[in-house]
From Swiss-Prot:
It comes from Actinobacillus pleuropneumoniae serotype 5b (strain L20). SUPFAM superfamilies: P-loop containing nucleoside triphosphate hydrolases. Gene3D superfamilies: P-loop containing nucleotide triphosphate hydrolases. GO terms for cellular component: cytoplasm. This is Pantothenate kinase.
Length: 316
């Protein structure tokens, strides 16, 4: 058996790092150290060993699911007697602020675009579907940024619905972490790729997170395979504070940065500020909205102290 035994009733198979790595089989590692460097997050130091151990087996699994999905589409279109439109396979990646969702998404994008054949893989972040800064200010939602009510959920649902309808030239708004706002009149265009990776805090959330929404469908209804990147909250807070301190010395020093004023803080002041932001905003959002969605994922990646993934949980 290549999984951990447990008496607890669970819908997941649980693998330790070594057992999961064995499932790579013969999947080739085509990434080099040079390829990996631009994929890493601002505060992460991830090795090629992590790619081989965790992400290559995951790429192999996802490729099996994609093959089965294509077969199901063919059966449905044959039954309906209609031409088969090109419908992208949607992978969602959820998890807390500072857990490393973006890095996981970029690594998967690189791997899935290279093997077993060349594919077009688009990566979209749901940050682009946040309300503009002026709207958040008008709604008094600046301290709720990242919470469900801070997103234009209707626009996001329409976006993923259009992808699954096989539509072409679909526009996704672009978010700037420098200005802390949507960039006006700039878009990423999704034009029938083979795979779309949708990364964000809210991609696993459902009706309970949007009680006032008139929709009876949500982003998760359009997703083919969902991933949740997990870690203990103490680690998440530690990583958030460390990232904040690095930003204070780099991105925040740009006079155009929304958080430029933080660059003038002393290190102790910056630590207190980052801790307060975590406790009042990010940690609260994690407990109320993000963590409760974890068990809906098809796969959970659990990180340890060094950002390395120690445990993988796969839905049966």
């Amino acid at each position: 058996m290549s999984l951990q035994k447990s008496n607890k009733i669970t819908p997941f198979l649980t693998f330790d790092r070594q057992k999961w790595a064995e499932l790579r089989k013969s999947v080739p590692l085509k990434l080099t150290e040079q390829d990996l460097k631009p994929l890493l997050g601002f505060n992460e130091d991830l090795s090629l060993d992590e790619v081989s151990t965790i992400y290559l087996p995951l790429a192999r699994l996802i490729n099996y699911y994609i093959e089965e999905n294509l077969k199901r589409q063919t059966v449905l279109h044959r039954f309906l007697d209609v031409a088969s439109p090109k419908v992208p396979y949607i992978i969602s990646i959820a998890g807390s602020v500072s857990v490393g969702k973006s890095t996981s998404a970029r690594i998967l994008q690189a791997l899935l675009s290279q093997w077993p054949s060349e594919r077009k893989v688009d990566l979209i972040t749901t940050d682009g579907f946040l309300y503009p800064l002026t709207t958040l200010q008008e709604k008094d939602l600046l301290k709720r940024k990242g919470f469900p009510e801070s997103y234009d959920i209707h626009r996001l649902i329409q976006f993923v619905s259009d992808i699954k309808s096989g539509k072409r030239h679909i526009q996704a708004p672009i978010y700037s972490h420098l200005t802390y706002d949507i960039i006006p009149d700039q878009y990423n265009v999704v034009d029938q790729p083979d795979i779309v990776i949708l990364e964000g805090l809210n991609v696993l959330q459902s009706g309970m997170n949007y009680p006032s929404s008139p929709h009876n469908v949500f982003v998760s209804d359009f997703v083919d395979f969902s991933i949740y990147v997990d870690a203990d909250e103490d680690l998440l807070k530690e990583w958030y504070v460390a990232r904040f301190l690095k930003f204070r010395r780099s991105a925040f020093s740009d006079p155009n940065a929304y958080f430029h004023h933080y660059s003038k803080l002393s290190e102790q002041e910056a630590i207190r500020t980052a801790s307060s932001i975590w406790d009042e905003i990010n940690g609260l959002n994690l407990k109320q909205n993000i963590l409760p969605s974890r068990e809906r994922a098809n796969l959970i990646l659990i990180k340890g102290e060094d950002h390395a993934i120690q445990t993988v949980k796969l839905r049966k």
